[in-house]
Design a protein with these regions (language model features):
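N-terminal beta1-alpha1-beta2 submodule of the flavodoxin-like/Rossmannoid cofactor-binding fold
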Residues: 4-86, 90, 97-99, 108, ...
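Short, surface-exposed alpha-helical segments at coil->helix boundaries
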Residues: 25, 29, 100, 128-133, ...
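Structural signal for conserved beta-strand scaffold positions within catalytic alpha/beta enzyme cores
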Residues: 41, 119, 146-149
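Substrate-binding/catalytic groove segments of enzymes
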Residues: 97-101, 142-143
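Glycine-rich, phosphate-binding/catalytic loops in enzymes
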Residues: 105-108, 135-137
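A short helix->loop->beta-strand "cap" motif at the edges of active sites that frequently abuts
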Residues: 113-116, 141
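Short beta-alpha junction loops
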Residues: 121-126
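Glycine-rich phosphate/pyrophosphate-binding loop and the adjoining helix
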Residues: 143-167
Length: 167
């Protein structure tokens, strides 16, 4: 179930994701399916265009945001209430070896107290690096587990095995 601020939780597990190209979205949807989790998309107030994501152009929006760690892009759409969730997966692409700055906006504006948080990322070649640790530090609350990088083509069976390995 895709959640907004007024939705009632149907599960004690939530998959939160940010995706510009659909790769992370696909993994998040499969993860929600195998865990029975609710699903929430972090939507930027100003959507990213293909030009914004051109990694070969140092003047693009995404490059500028990543070059300035203090940048906090605004989140649009409805917010999500984390009350009632005990396990939260947070998925995102890796941009220039790090989490996109909009993830910083999200974790700094939510309370993860008494939550187990599992970061996951998608990337064409980079690993998860320190992004999960960076987000945990910014959040300041929650029990953040070691995250993992998944390919966009990861199967539900592979995701199930990963989830089981977290226990």
């Amino acid at each position: 179930m895709l959640l907004g601020v007024s939705a009632l939780a149907e599960s004690d597990t939530l998959v939160i994701y940010f995706s510009c190209t659909g790769t992370t979205k696909g993994v998040a949807e499969r993860l929600a399916s195998v865990t029975g989790a609710d699903l929430y998309e972090i939507v930027p107030a100003v959507p990213y265009t293909a030009e914004d994501l051109n990694y070969n152009d140092r003047s693009t929006r995404a490059t500028s945001e990543q070059d300035h760690p203090e940048t906090r892009p605004e989140i649009g759409g409805e917010d999500v209430d984390l009350t009632g969730y005990s396990t939260i997966y947070i998925g995102y692409p890796i941009w220039w070896g790090e989490e996109p700055r909009i993830l910083c906006t999200f974790v700094e504006s939510h309370d993860f107290t008494d939550k187990t948080v599992i970061p996951f990322c998608t990337s064409g070649g980079s690993g998860i690096g320190r992004s999960g640790d960076d987000l945990a530090k910014l959040a300041g609350t929650g029990n953040w587990l070691k995250g993992a990088r998944h390919s966009g083509s990861i199967s539900e069976n592979e995701l199930s095995a990963w989830v089981e390995g977290l226990k």
